[in-house]
């Protein structure tokens, strides 16, 4: 930032002595911005009291204020801006009552902050850096030539102090304004996601990409010119080595190097932080989509069915043919010819027949839960069933039991999108994840 020749106590005493104060409510600030806009259209930069009253009348109309007292309130607003040193009033004895008003540097700075400085332009930044490069190159050449104190003051110190430093401060101000702009974009994105995240996805993507592009353009422009600027500053610094009389130049060069480092490092840091925020927003959207799919799908389906007559819709689904695993070739290889008769215990049984009998038995046992409307804890029932059979049969038994249990009913927790806990069902590490079936 700019250097101050006064100390803190001196500045505090000066502000107290001159009774400095700033109070700008929204109405006053809008009035000041309107005056600045009107001032930009005037070649002489002067405004009469009638012009200011007309501007205030427009502001009052925008804020939906009464029209009866507009003249009195306009006079109070003008006097308030003059008192706060935002406007200068010039009166003449020859033309009494026809005062001329001009914006003060403070008024121009405040209005410029809200109107023009917020307009980021890569071309403007490139021109500023080009001017800085020319000034530093000329100052470096003058420093290497050497000369008396007047030469150093005029050809080295003055360009660095009143041109390069001010442009660095302007770039720094632009970066700080972009910080506020990013915060505003974040508030806009938060508002969009709060209202309706499905409709806001495209708008959020646009805001994220625009801000990312602006930050990248700014950083690319700074990095392209940063090395050359540092090289010229080092040339000037080398020329002042060993010369105590040029300490003021060396101190200024050191401050400029610190400003340039801060400007370039800010650009990369801002990009890194924005990338993190971009990922956070996308993660939030993905999480919202997943939660909506699991939690609100049933509710939206019911609403769609209920409102079908008002808003007809069509359901498209895939009905592909099932793929059957045919093992005839393997069975033919195992079909060895045998002689004699087998005992009944060794007679071959088709797996499908065995499975049907087991399924019928399990279905009969599970019907008790449905008849008595008792909750069916699938994990507990699986543990009890699997304890009756050897380990080799656990997988087949668990599959049959789960199929039969699912046919009986559903779990209320499934509609709420809640994730079930894993439960152990045997002593060999097998687990199942299922809610208690409570609706048949």
UniProtKB/Swiss-Prot annotation:
It is found in: Cytoplasm, Nucleoid. SUPFAM superfamilies: MukF C-terminal domain-like, Winged helix' DNA-binding domain. One of its GO terms (cellular component) is cytoplasm. Keywords: Calcium, Cell cycle, Cell division, Chromosome partition, Cytoplasm, DNA condensation. One of its GO terms (biological process) is chromosome segregation. InterPro entries: Chromosome_partition_MukF, MukF_C, MukF_C_sf, MukF_M, MukF_M_sp, MukF_WHTH, WH-like_DNA-bd_sf, WH_DNA-bd_sf. Involved in chromosome condensation, segregation and cell cycle progression. May participate in facilitating chromosome segregation by condensation DNA from both sides of a centrally located replisome during cell division. Not required for mini-F plasmid partitioning. Probably acts via its interaction with MukB and MukE. Overexpression results in anucleate cells. It has a calcium binding activity. Belongs to the MukF family. Interacts, and probably forms a ternary complex, with MukE and MukB via its C-terminal region. The complex formation is stimulated by calcium or magnesium. It is required for an interaction between MukE and MukB. This is Chromosome partition protein MukF. It comes from Edwardsiella ictaluri (strain 93-146). The lineage of its organism: Bacteria, Pseudomonadati, Pseudomonadota, Gammaproteobacteria, Enterobacterales.
